[in-house]
Regions:
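Hydrophobic h-region of N-terminal signal peptides that target proteins for export
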Residues: 8-16
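Active-site-proximal cap/lid insertion segments
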Residues: 18, 33-35, 39-41, 155-159, ...
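Sec-dependent signal peptide recognition
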Residues: 1-7
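Catalytic-site neighborhoods of secreted/periplasmic enzymes
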Residues: 74-187
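Active-site-proximal N-terminal segment of extracellular/periplasmic enzymes that hydrolyze or transfer
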Residues: 18-57, 66-67, 176
Length: 312
């Protein structure tokens, strides 16, 4: 149960002077590790994520267990490799044998109040209330999730709490690639002069396995970018970064609620993502492939005994 062990280790390292700290786990969907301004990316501005990272420990070499939402989340909340327990594709049901061993259940059994808001995707989009150890405090929607979490944080808790805030964005880049409307408000069409440049590894890799090109060709609804021009890809990257900024603003509301309720002294905050996005590298959108942009994920914890980053 490697993820659970890692999660426990992160919490204990941040909380050596805190007995039974509160735990807040915030994670996004499809956010690559370079998609933060504090990662040195000049194409976006993420003051709230930067604020968390500056106060904590940033793990530069964090990788997801699987480059797809359902399997990655399965690993997060069970601690098992997805293929080992039948969670290898989106829509795979959680095995009954694991329901009593999930992260929420284990932490609840340790004496915590456990709450979950936002996207679940194992396989239902929302976590069933009172299952997997969690009270469901909000539906699968980025709109209103921060407010629901802020309300939860304002309560007078008799026990330490474990709060999960699971955001959908920047996953809405999938809708952009398919020319569909965004669920949480559209992004303005930019002038091409305002768009980021192409990545250094924009060209397709001639040594890629045939299965990668086959996946691209045979799943047009997932990878509708075969006809994208370089300008289209630049606009894709612009839109992706605006979606990251959108979710950064929402996460800022949760950070403000932590401030208002004076929770920093006895609270550990962990931030991560389930996987990244191709963002045009190798002319790839979405996930699934084992490209660095897709498997290298955000991971950091706050607060930290001192500001630092580690390559672990």
């Amino acid at each position: 149960m490697k993820y659970l062990a890692c999660f426990s280790l992160l919490c204990s390292s941040m909380a050596s002077a805190i007995e039974r700290p509160n735990i807040i786990y915030i994670f996004t969907d499809q956010q690559t590790a370079s998609a933060m301004s504090c990662a040195g990316n000049p194409d976006l501005h993420t003051p709230n994520l930067d604020r968390l990272a500056a106060a904590g420990i940033l793990f530069n070499n964090a990788y997801c267990t699987a480059p797809l939402s359902g399997p990655s989340r399965g690993a997060m909340f069970t601690g098992y490799y997805p293929d080992a327990v039948g969670l290898s594709v989106n829509g795979s049901p959680m095995p009954d044998s694991l329901k009593a061993q999930t992260l929420g259940t284990l932490i609840k059994n340790a004496g915590y109040d456990c709450a979950y808001g936002g996207k679940w995707h194992l396989p239902l989009l929302e976590v069933p209330d009172k299952e997997y150890g969690f009270d469901n405090i909000y539906k699968h929607s980025d709109d209103g999730l921060a407010e629901a979490c802020a309300e939860y944080l304002s309560r007078k808790h008799k026990k330490p709490f474990f709060l999960v805030a699971s955001y959908d964005n920047p996953h809405n880049i999938c809708e952009y690639a398919r020319r569909q409307n965004f669920p949480y408000g559209n992004i303005d069409i930019p002038d091409i002069r305002d768009c980021p440049g192409l990545p250094a590894n924009f060209a397709k890799n001639p040594y890629d396995a045939d299965v990668i090109e086959s996946e691209r060709i045979n799943n047009y609804n997932v990878y509708p970018t075969a006809g994208f021009t370089p300008e289209d890809w630049r606009m894709y990257r612009y839109t992706y970064y605006r979606l990251v900024e959108k979710v950064d603003r929402e996460i800022g509301k949760i950070i403000d609620a932590i401030d208002r309720n004076n929770l920093w002294e006895n609270t550990v905050v962990i931030f991560s993502s389930d996987h990244g996005d191709g963002i045009g590298a190798h002319r790839w959108n979405q996930k699934s492939a084992l490209y660095e942009e897709i498997i290298n994920c955000l991971l950091y914890t706050s607060p930290s005994p001192r500001d630092r980053s580690v390559s672990r």
